[in-house]
Amino acid sequence: MEELKPIGADASGYEVVTKAVLELLNQYPGLNGRDILFEELGAEDGIAFSSDSGPLVLAERISITDHVRQSCQYPFFVVYRTTATREFQKLNIQTFLDSLGKWLCKEPVEVDKETYQLKQYPKLSENRKITRITRENAYGLVPNENNSQDWMLPVTIQYTNEFDLW
């Protein structure tokens, strides 16, 4: 299957989708009292998410009645920053991010010996609807000069956007 290239940006969807992602991420049952913030990390620890491109339009159809249907995606990544140096601590971070990714993709995950599964994606406003969430594998970056290390989980939300031109 050929990968679609962006043909534009869903600029008006940036705030809508970003807010929904922040709320969804903070519903993850494995947070244990922690919060995932938007583009805000401490020097040595924290969990945040960021999107370097914002929402992108991949395809667009305009009907003869000027009804527009766009296929869009919102690529983002979750960053887990830590000063952990032991292998088992790093494996716990990798497991946390992998479980978060599975949960976002509606796969069952085990947290504290209980199974959780996301049943439905959050509703978006302004005629946008999430159709699918996909993820890649989490990975660690090279440690910073202060010995903190960032672990990344790339995620992509696919959604539709419908509106009338008139």
Regions found by a protein language model. Name each.
Residues 1-37, 56-166:
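Charged, amphipathic alpha-helical segments and their flanking helix caps
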Residues 40-62:
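Amphipathic, interaction-prone secondary-structure segments
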